[in-house]
Amino acid sequence: SAVVKRCAERITAYQIWNEASLSMFWNGSPEKLAAMTKSASDIIKAKDPKAIVVAASTTVRLPGAFDRFFPKYLAALGALGWPVDAFAAHLYPASKDTTDERAAFVDLVKADLAAANAPDLPVWDTELNYGLAGPGPTNPRQTIEGAQARDWVVQTAFDSLHLGIARTYWYIWTPLPYPLLGMQLTNDSGAVKGLRVVDQWVVGATWQGCVDDGSVVSCSVDKKGIPSVIAWAKNETGTFAPPADLTQACNTANKCSAVTGPVELTETPTRFTE
């Protein structure tokens, strides 16, 4: 109550708990956390009705912990009338895994939401990185840097847009490298270059939706009257025929080449523009 009173209209969203699927952060029951979520929501909404109440986040990469916590937490929230405005997950994959596994985790979260008959609320990925050590000793920390980091950041952004993740928060932008992370987000890092590419391609644009043909996902964008299509293969490679008026294919380094017909794509998004 004191926090909301002091910070009303300065804090726009309150996530109720961090990684509650892990006993190191929460050792009560899912039902008890749901009750606390309801109490916190009532306090927040009474003092700042415009604030967004975000459910406690769950991790996914430890499937046992996820399965023990998330369905029961959702059921308890439902019994309390769904006192949240958004759901949250931390979609870190195992250290050796890739953007593919992160996308699969989105499907797991959404499947549990559907099974719980949850309302159609935004889903946020409130903490994400790649290459973090774990789970277990067979998954040591990996280093993802340079062009690979740039590509994964761009791919993650478009996976989120395509799969319905309303917000994606990267952990963590730092002035100097942070040893915990597999992917550094310093100002000159490949990952931050990827964020700048996403900004150039879609921030301030009108998102016009995606088409998934089973092999390729293609998403249409209009930015200040300039149309483009961002497309990528779902499984390593796929062939895509861009609209005839889009004659340039640009990679995540913003290096462009002329196209006159179908293009062989990889899982890294390519931008087609005039």
Residue positions per predicted region:
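Aromatic/acidic polysaccharide-binding cleft in carbohydrate-active enzymes
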Residues: N129-Q200, C210-S215
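Noncatalytic carbohydrate-binding groove/subsite architecture in carbohydrate-active enzymes
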Residues: P30-V154, L163
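Short acidic/polar active-site loop segments enriched in Thr and Asp
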Residues: E9-T12, D85, A166-R167
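Carbohydrate-binding surface patches
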Residues: V211-L246, T252
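C-terminal beta-strand-rich structural cap/linker in extracellular carbohydrate-active enzymes
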Residues: C256-E274
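Substrate-binding cleft of extracellular glycoside hydrolase catalytic domains
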Residues: S1-S21, F25, S29-A35, K50, ...
